[in-house]
Curated annotation (Swiss-Prot):
The lineage of its organism: Bacteria, Pseudomonadati, Myxococcota, Myxococcia, Myxococcales. Pfam families: ThiG (PF05690). The keyword Glycoprotein does not apply. It comes from the Bacteria. This is Thiazole synthase. Pathway: Cofactor biosynthesis; thiamine diphosphate biosynthesis. Catalyzes the rearrangement of 1-deoxy-D-xylulose 5-phosphate (DXP) to produce the thiazole phosphate moiety of thiamine. Sulfur is provided by the thiocarboxylate moiety of the carrier protein ThiS. In vitro, sulfur can be provided by H(2)S. The active site is at K102 (schiff-base intermediate with dxp). The gene is thiG. Its EC number is 2.8.1.10.
Length: 261
């Protein structure tokens, strides 16, 4: 019996694509736009503190994002305190970007792991101010529950350090988070190639967020297509239900009516 599929919905908004992309590290704005189109994504993140607000025309990143098709998710990359993150979200709102935010409060410059205490603190403030908060967090079910209790619209545990491409390092913890919270779980960070995205989706998460895996590929547009297919295949595999793992082989051909010589 397969699992019944359900729409990917965040804060009452339903998305057809379960793939969320970033806007950084691409060889060019044109390639970024082509990747967004090829991937089928409907939501993209933008690092507010990296935006060149003086840029105009083709030099402006924002002019390469199709706001009619894509929901903007400003993020608080490079923030190391709750106060910085909250100020950055307020700036994004003032710039007319969005009240939806990817909350990212880092605790360490080397690993880029989240400071979960500051993340929860910022989440509580932002939710009270009416933001729809999607927090980048560790693969810890206790923190995930605290973020859900704070009013976050989803939780986004890392699969591995940001930009590492190490893949799904701790699938057990991702499963624990899925059992712990009722809001959507989105794997964020660590995906390196299409098989990583498929594995993440096979765990039962609602979506995958990535940037470097596509932007840093030798052929970003082709990788965007691969990621689209991987996310769809992983979701289908999760819904279909995999066979149990066994220690020994099991013949696939029936033995009834076997011809004996």
């Amino acid at each position: 019996m397969s699992i019944q599929d359900k729409p990917f919905t965040i804060a009452g908004v339903t998305f057809s694509s379960r793939l969320i992309l970033g806007t950084g590290k691409y060889p060019s704005h044109d390639i970024m736009k082509r990747c967004h189109e090829s991937s089928g994504t409907e939501m993209v993140t933008v690092a507010v503190r990296r935006l060149d607000l003086k840029a105009t025309g083709e030099a402006s990143l924002m002019n390469w994002i199709d706001r009619n098709r894509l929901r903007l998710l400003p993020n608080t990359a490079l923030c190391y305190t709750a106060d910085d993150a909250v100020r950055t979200c307020r700036l994004a709102e003032e710039l007319g970007m969005s009240k939806w935010v990817k909350l990212e409060v880092l605790g360490d410059e080397k690993t880029l792991y989240p400071d979960v205490e500051e993340t929860v603190k910022a989440a509580r403030i932002l939710v009270k101010e009416g933001f729809t908060v999607l927090p980048y967090t560790s693969d810890d079910p206790i923190t995930a529950r605290k973020l859900e209790d704070a009013g976050c619209a989803a939780v986004m545990p890392l699969a591995a350090p940001i930009g590492s491409g190490l893949g799904i390092r701790n699938p057990h913890n991702i499963r624990l988070i899925l059992e712990t919270v009722k809001v959507p779980v989105i794997v964020d960070a660590g995906v390196g190639t299409a098989s990583d995205a498929a594995i993440a989706m096979e765990l039962g998460v609602e979506a995958v967020l990535m940037n470097t895996a596509i932007a840093g590929a030798q052929d970003p547009v082709r990788m965007a297509v691969a990621m689209k297919k991987a996310v769809e295949a992983g979701r289908d595999a999760y819904l279909a239900g995999r066979i149990p793992r066994k220690a020994y082989g099991s013949a696939s051909s029936p033995i009834d009516g076997l011809v004996h010589h």
